[in-house]
């Protein structure tokens, strides 16, 4: 049995998967478009990096120690706890910031994305972080290789 309540949410009382039904193709489209505006995945980041797309930077929001152990190639380390106007002043405002952390169970990328957005940057969070990057079979780098002084100096 399907019913409609006062807030136009459809309720299917016959199962958990279909308990709450989408409210039509327009709202479904808007929902998924909204998600894709703020999230990306490792395979898209890798493909764009490999293809030489240069309209984004990859930001590692973890600690310098975690970054030194391994990170996405070419990533810039700015720990989320240290993100502010001064520590992000070298980042270009005309590029998208793609932020990641360790993966599921780590919310440094969410916190970093929020901070960067509050500072006026266009931001996407890389789903699954470094964990899903590696599960997809992509290589990582070790050590603080960026020429950015923040990589070595943030503690």
Question: Where in this protein do the model-derived segments appear?
Answer:
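Flexible, polar/low-complexity N-terminal or interdomain linker segments that lie immediately upstream
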Residues: 1-58, 62-66, 144-155
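Short loop/helix-cap segments at secondary-structure boundaries that form the rim of catalytic
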Residues: 67-73
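Alpha-helical scaffolding within the catalytic cores
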Residues: 82-87
């Amino acid at each position: 049995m399907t019913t409609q309540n006062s807030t136009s949410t459809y309720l299917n009382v016959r199962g958990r998967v279909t308990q709450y039904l989408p409210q039509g193709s327009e709202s479904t489209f808007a929902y998924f478009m909204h998600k894709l505006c703020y999230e990306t995945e490792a395979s898209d980041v890798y493909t764009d990096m490999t293809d030489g797309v240069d309209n984004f930077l990859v930001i590692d929001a973890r600690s310098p120690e975690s970054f030194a152990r391994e990170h996405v190639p070419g990533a810039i380390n700015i720990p989320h706890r240290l993100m502010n106007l001064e520590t992000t002043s070298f980042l270009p405002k005309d590029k998208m910031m793609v932020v990641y952390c360790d993966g599921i169970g780590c919310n440094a990328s969410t916190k970093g994305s929020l901070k960067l957005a509050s500072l006026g940057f266009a931001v996407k969070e890389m789903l699954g972080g470094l964990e899903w990057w590696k599960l997809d079979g992509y290589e990582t780098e070790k050590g603080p290789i960026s020429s950015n002084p923040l990589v070595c100096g943030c503690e």
